[in-house]
From Swiss-Prot:
This is UDP-N-acetylglucosamine--N-acetylmuramyl-(pentapeptide) pyrophosphoryl-undecaprenol N-acetylglucosamine transferase. Belongs to the glycosyltransferase 28 family. MurG subfamily. Cell wall formation. Catalyzes the transfer of a GlcNAc subunit on undecaprenyl-pyrophosphoryl-MurNAc-pentapeptide (lipid intermediate I) to form undecaprenyl-pyrophosphoryl-MurNAc-(pentapeptide)GlcNAc (lipid intermediate II). SUPFAM superfamilies: UDP-Glycosyltransferase/glycogen phosphorylase. Keywords: Cell cycle, Cell division, Cell membrane, Cell shape, Cell wall biogenesis/degradation, Glycosyltransferase, Membrane, Peptidoglycan synthesis, Transferase. GO terms for biological process: carbohydrate metabolic process; cell division; cell wall organization; lipid glycosylation; peptidoglycan biosynthetic process; regulation of cell shape. It is a peripheral membrane protein. GO terms for molecular function: undecaprenyldiphospho-muramoylpentapeptide beta-N-acetylglucosaminyltransferase activity. One of its GO terms (cellular component) is plasma membrane. InterPro entries: GlcNAc_MurG, Glyco_trans_28_C, GlycoTrans_28_N. Its main location: membrane.
Amino acid sequence: MPKKILFTGGGTVGHVTLNLILIPKFIKDGWEVHYIGDKNGIEHTEIEKSGLDVTFHAIATGKLRRYFSWQNLADVFKVALGLLQSLFIVAKLRPQALFSKGGFVSVPPVVAAKLLGKPVFIHESDRSMGLANKIAYKFATTVYTTFEQEDQLSKVKHLGAVTKVFKDANQIPESTQLEAVKEYFSRDLKTLLFIGGSAGAHVFNQFISDHPELKQRYNIINITGDPHLNELSSHLYRVDYVTDLYQPLMAMADLVVTRGGSNTLFELLAMAKLHLIVPLGKEASRGDQLENATYFEKRGYAKQLQEPDLTLHNFDQAMADLFEHQADYEATMLATKEIQSPDFFYDLLRADISSAIKEK
């Protein structure tokens, strides 16, 4: 009988990415892989798109809020239903372990696995735990963290960032699509790549639209999330979404302007890519991006600019400062010890699963 592992996590791409890195490794080693999530969530979309041999189990989901809302009442019942569904799934499958990447959908499966005596392993990407992982921590066997946590928690293992991206990713691969973009760009100008993510692209899109003079100073690549903005013209490439072209565009850029999501930040760190962080504020998130950005700035990896301060004058000043001190930023990033390979983490996780099973 093959070993079985349950994955969960969703709500944003960041809550799925690491799972999609680990799943093929388990499949290759003969594990039967199952995933618990929201059938309308991005986790289901990404699993379907991956083509991996994974059985998806849909459960009811409700959002966990730190503030009062009448919707909390309805969501309590959704979470309760999700827990019952998760208990049934875990009891039926009898997996060796559950791995959670967080997000609201992950709490019921984590609780269910713990109640049924299954080891629970969680990964936290941000400087501080989100509400879902704070709850899940109580039921976890081990929590792996990208950042060193300020609170000394007994179940936490500081891992560093797990990414497939490394310094050699700066080598630009051959691409006919990329060659077409280069024809519109000037070799005499620095190339900037704007990455806003699913929640933060709009501000960058508007900033570029409001300041056409940017095209006179830089080559601009703008991943917009909006197909209506697609454009390839002199010194400007706007595209709604990229997959295979993402890494070539990243390598092509002299500097990346990004939000403060940890996955992207650590990809940039792994590549030693010069970057400016414009984090989402507390009005658009729980403040995790502000913490991530401050951490990166204090470590000397990057410079940050708060969204309310994103004016053309401040932006140009930030660009000048970053390019003036480019060698210092790159040297600091190259010296980092905060990056781990997927193989390293997979081996660690497998060893911890084996230890947890033996201790039962």
